[in-house]
Structures are given as C-alpha cells and as structure tokens.
From Swiss-Prot:
Keyword ATP-binding appears in the UniProt entry: no
Keyword Secreted in annotation: yes
Protein name from the UniProt record: Orcomyotropin
A single GO cellular-component term on record: extracellular region
Compartmental location: Secreted
GO biological process: neuropeptide signaling pathway
Membrane-spanning ranges: none
Species annotation: Faxonius limosus (Spinycheek crayfish)
Record key words, sorted: Amidation, Neuropeptide, Secreted
Length: 8
C-alpha cells in the first residue's frame, strides 16, 4: 500500500 505514490 502506498497512498503517496500510487494510492494502492
């Protein structure tokens, strides 16, 4: 999960 880059 990467809310700052992909949102996933």
């Amino acid at each position: 999960f990467d809310a700052f880059t992909t949102g996933f």
